[in-house]
A protein has these predicted regions:
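Enzyme catalytic cores with a strong preference for nitrogen-chemistry domains
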Residues: 1-219
Length: 219
């Protein structure tokens, strides 16, 4: 990474479940502010478009389609500020290890200058406590993929991915990432704030790169 300053803004706010149009407007409002402040990368939480957890809304094809259409609209709107946005993607890879799943993924899109520049699929799907992701999503199978902003190699991961020592972030760093961005929609727990902070600090030390950790609030 060169010495140029990279301006990164996190939109850590509420994205209600099912309110795709409302969430779209929130994202657009954030982009307008970010452009004014000359932000390089604007980060949104896990599944910011659909809200989290969307659960059985994912069984509605119209809901998935609306999520796609809005992502395309947001990409067309984007300009110099790059955005990392949580959404639901299709996962139709014939070689995928989870063929029994519905062919959708918990994903993050990277948008900039009117286009979708890249997509990351969440690899580790929690299926305990309030989490039921394995019921709906297929696992991502390209954990080491990188996203480039100018000459900076960036690894994107989603929530549970950052908890795994030999997981996506390690592969991304081995592939040359000099920064990790991890987006989340983890529920509030008064006892977990410190443990999450300690986890991210520990992973940053192990990987020897900065980690930006963004959560959703409200819901």
């Amino acid at each position: 990474m060169n010495k140029k300053t990279l301006r990164i803004t996190g939109a850590q706010m509420s994205f209600p479940v099912g309110a795709i149009q409302k969430n779209k407007q929130t994202i657009l409002d954030c982009f307008e502010i970010a452009e004014e402040k000359e932000t390089d990368i604007l980060i949104f939480p896990e599944l910011a478009l659909t809200g989290y957890p969307p659960e059985d809304l994912l069984l509605r094809e119209s809901f998935i389609g609306k999520n796609f259409a809005v992502l395309e609209e947001l990409a067309e709107f984007s300009s110099n500020t790059s955005g990392v946005i949580g959404f639901v993607d299709r996962n139709l890879d014939e070689d995928h290890t989870d063929k029994q799943k519905r062919g959708i993924a918990n994903a993050a899109a990277i948008i900039q200058n009117g286009d979708v520049k890249g997509i990351y699929h969440k690899c580790y799907l929690p299926n305990y406590s309030v989490f039921d992701e394995a019921r709906y999503f297929a696992k991502g199978n390209n954990p080491g993929n990188l996203f480039w902003y100018n000459d900076v190699a960036i690894g994107i991961s989603i929530c549970e991915d950052i908890w795994i020592d030999e997981g996506p972030s390690l592969q991304q760093v081995e592939n040359g990432a000099s920064l990790i961005i991890n987006i989340n929609a983890s529920p509030y727990d008064q006892n977990k704030s410190n443990s999450r902070k300690e986890l991210v600090i520990s992973q940053a030390k192990k990987l020897k790169v900065p980690i930006i950790y963004l959560n959703m609030v409200g819901g």
